[in-house]
């Protein structure tokens, strides 16, 4: 029961992070700055949690640098651009397709078995994606390039999940909290490098605007790792897959006027989440 609650909280916090990133971007903060300012508080939180456990064997967690390069590094940059251009709700639904890409890479590189549940889950996700693409009730700020950013970022998220799965079973034997901190610290370095490359300025008002999103992001990671530590993957993963629904629900509650959350968007989210749940159960 504890693992279920922790997984639900993690999913809800990730959905809240998406909405809070959108609210902060409305103030005019560039996505490059927004990415960095979201990851820094999250990195601090994961570091505090890892330190509180007293296990600082960072050497054992060095392979997770690769995972951090993918996400939150590259993926979070694309995610922030997607939220700016496509909106929080539509980005949430797109990110919800990550299990489809995770299964695809796992089938190819990890030789995981293909079962009927995975096929049905993949079909539901694809159907949800088609419904989302056919949704014409889009907000004024919507740009199609935002969905492209979201899709590429989702592939990075999914590849990260496969890498972590491989590292955790074949290579590294690191404490989960330290592994999360190393991945988040790497993501911070990537976002800082992108910030310097684009010569994007930082401001005090921008930093304050993104603190809530960063806190939600960091806590989401903490609760996620706690859930996996206390429960089976087959129980936790399907619940975590509901983060897309949380993103749509919170967008409707908080950003109702600007997001235009309609029936097609909700239907697409439900189909994508249902597919993600099936994939989580049958993996």
Language model feature labels by segment:
Residues 40-46, 101-107, 117-135, 262-283:
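Hydrophobic transmembrane alpha-helices of multi-pass small-molecule transport proteins
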Residues 66-76, 80-129, 178-185, 232-253:
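Specific alpha-helical transmembrane segments that line the substrate/conduction pathway
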Residues 8, 12, 36-40, 65, ...:
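Residue-level signature of the transmembrane alpha-helical core
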Residues 15-19, 47, 69-73, 77, ...:
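Hydrophobic/small/kink-forming positions within alpha-helical transmembrane segments
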Residues 145-169, 177:
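Selected transmembrane alpha-helices and immediately adjacent juxtamembrane segments
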Residues 218, 229-233:
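Intrinsically disordered, low-complexity segments enriched in Gly and acidic/Ser/Thr residues
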Residues 1-66, 76-86, 134-149, 170-172, ...:
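Membrane-interface interhelical linkers
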């Amino acid at each position: 029961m504890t693992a279920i609650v922790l997984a639900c909280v993690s999913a809800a916090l990730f959905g809240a992070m998406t909405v809070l990133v959108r609210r902060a971007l409305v103030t005019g903060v560039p996505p490059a700055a927004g990415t960095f300012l979201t990851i820094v508080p999250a990195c601090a939180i994961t570091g505090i949690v890892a330190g509180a456990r007293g296990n600082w064997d960072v050497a054992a967690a060095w392979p997770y640098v690769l995972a951090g390069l993918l996400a939150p590094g590259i993926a979070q940059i694309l995610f922030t651009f997607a939220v700016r251009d496509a909106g929080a709700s539509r980005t949430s639904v797109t990110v919800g397709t990550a299990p489809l890409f995770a299964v695809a890479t796992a089938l190819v590189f990890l030789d995981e078995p293909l079962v009927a549940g995975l096929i049905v889950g993949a079909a539901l996700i694809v159907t949800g994606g088609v419904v989302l693409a056919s949704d014409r009730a889009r907000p004024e700020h919507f740009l199609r390039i935002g969905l492209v950013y979201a899709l590429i970022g989702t592939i990075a998220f999914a590849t990260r999940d496969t890498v972590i799965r491989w590292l955790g079973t074949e290579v590294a034997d690191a404490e989960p909290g330290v592994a999360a901190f190393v991945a988040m610290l790497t993501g911070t370095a990537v976002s800082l490098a992108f910030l310097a490359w684009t010569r994007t300025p930082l401001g005090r008002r921008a930093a304050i605007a993104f603190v809530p999103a960063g806190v939600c992001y960091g806590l989401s990671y903490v609760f996620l790792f706690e859930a996996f530590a206390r429960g089976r993957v087959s129980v936790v993963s399907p619940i975590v897959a509901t983060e897309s629904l949380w993103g749509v629900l919170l967008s409707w509650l908080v950003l109702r006027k600007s997001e235009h959350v309609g029936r097609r968007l909700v239907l697409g989210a439900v189909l994508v989440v249902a597919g993600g749940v099936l994939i989580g159960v049958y993996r």
